[in-house]
């Protein structure tokens, strides 16, 4: 038995033994293209945690279009036996940004390496499996099979507002895609942000230093402040940041650069009888960073954070500028004073400990 597997099993046992008291309430907001990959495995970490109550999953477009993202989320829940968790349809399009405006921007300032649902050309020999571009209302054939269950009635924004009112001060919004659904909830209810306990978001980019100049470094080599979850809908990011959340924790690209889904992880997952581990092993994402998984993990176990920094943060929404969608930061109190929030940005994590938490969660 490998040292990694032994450590994982011990961690899983200790977590199960310590799961007592009130369960932490969370809503997962995802652009859940699948099967497998960071979007799905991150949700599984929360779903598998014995001290977490996942109230629901809200879905928007981003990595994929909303219709296909919803289908993949529903099918994942079927495969891991969690059809008790409702899935709500959210935004199909960004608030202002569009494929046409993005293409005009590229004509002036150069190509954006990754464009999610708008991708028409992929890098050769990419670790990511290229997906053929299609219209928003098309759901391509699904490797994992089509879901039998349906999305819940109502919109994602309505669900977010309703649950925040029902459990004031208790709910974490775990956002791992663009912030369109969150922004719509903010606009729907002025008290939404005040009713939420905290907002965790995998988004923004400060100055990521990838371990090598691989395909995931290309996006940040010349544009270190651009992150896809912001660039898809910069206006939504600004609205969410300015909404008045009591606590905002950002997991930017920087913190994720040392993480990877490794071949050893895959072999470990293959030996597990857990439905979540079986799903992850059947649809592996070997070689890819664990972006969203890390965001859930530092919420589950803040001790994984090696270094974080408090800063004021905002986003460039000047669509005609070269910096449209880029992250803007200042030392607290040194910004322009236009309502930019103070956030906690995770800079580095204890990678080996995170790997154990990641595997233990899926194998539980």
Regions found by a protein language model. Name each.
Residues 22-24, 41-54, 221-222, 228-364:
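Conformational coupling and interaction surfaces
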Residues 104-124:
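A charged helix-plus-loop insertion that forms the helical arch/lid used to bind
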Residues 1-6:
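Bacterial N-terminal signal peptides that target proteins for export
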Residues 86-94:
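A short, structured active-site edge motif that brings together acidic residues
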Residues 21-83, 100, 120, 125-249, ...:
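Active-site histidine-anchored catalytic micro-motif
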Residues 93-97, 256-258:
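A short acidic, often aromatic-flanked loop/helix-cap motif at beta-alpha or helix-coil junctions
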Residues 100-107, 283:
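Extended, histidine- and acidic-residue-enriched regions that form the cofactor-binding/catalytic faces
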Residues 9-18:
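Hydrophobic h-region of N-terminal signal peptides that target proteins for export
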């Amino acid at each position: 038995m490998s040292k990694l597997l032994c450590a994982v099993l011990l961690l899983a046992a200790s977590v199960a033994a310590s799961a007592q008291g009130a369960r932490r309430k969370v809503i997962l907001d995802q652009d859940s293209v699948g099967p497998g990959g960071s979007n799905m495995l991150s949700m599984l970490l929360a779903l598998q945690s014995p001290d977490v109550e996942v109230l629901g999953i809200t879905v928007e477009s981003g990595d994929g279009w909303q219709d296909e993202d919803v289908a993949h989320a529903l099918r994942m829940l079927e495969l891991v036996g969690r059809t008790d968790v409702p899935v709500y349809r959210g935004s199909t399009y960004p608030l202002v940004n569009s494929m046409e405006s993005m293409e005009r921007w590229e004509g002036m300032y150069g190509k954006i390496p990754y464009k999610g649902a708008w991708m028409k050309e992929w890098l050769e020999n990419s670790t990511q499996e290229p997906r053929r571009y299609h219209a928003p209302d098309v759901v391509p054939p699904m490797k994992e099979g089509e879901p039998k269950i349906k999305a819940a009635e109502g919109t994602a924004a309505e669900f977010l507002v309703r649950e925040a009112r029902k459990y004031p001060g208790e709910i974490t919004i775990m956002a791992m895609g663009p912030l369109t659904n969150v922004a719509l909830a903010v606009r729907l209810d002025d008290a939404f942000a005040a009713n939420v306990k905290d907002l965790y978001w995998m988004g923004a980019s400060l100055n990521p230093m990838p371990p090598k100049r691989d395909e995931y470094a290309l996006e940040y080599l010349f544009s270190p402040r651009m992150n896809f979850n912001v660039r898809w809908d910069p206006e939504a990011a600004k609205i969410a940041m300015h909404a008045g959340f009591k606590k905002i924790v950002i997991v930017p690209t920087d913190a994720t650069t040392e993480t990877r889904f490794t071949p050893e992880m895959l072999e470990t997952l293959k030996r597990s009888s857990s439905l979540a581990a079986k799903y992850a092993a059947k649809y592996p994402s070997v070689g890819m960073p664990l972006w969203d998984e890390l965001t859930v993990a530092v919420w589950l176990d803040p001790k994984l954070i090696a270094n974080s920094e408090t800063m004021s943060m905002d986003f460039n929404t000047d669509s005609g500028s070269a910096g449209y969608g880029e992250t803007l930061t200042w030392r607290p109190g040194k910004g322009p004073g236009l309502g930019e929030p103070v956030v906690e940005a995770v800079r580095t994590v204890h990678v080996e400990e995170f790997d154990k938490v990641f595997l233990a969660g899926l194998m539980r």
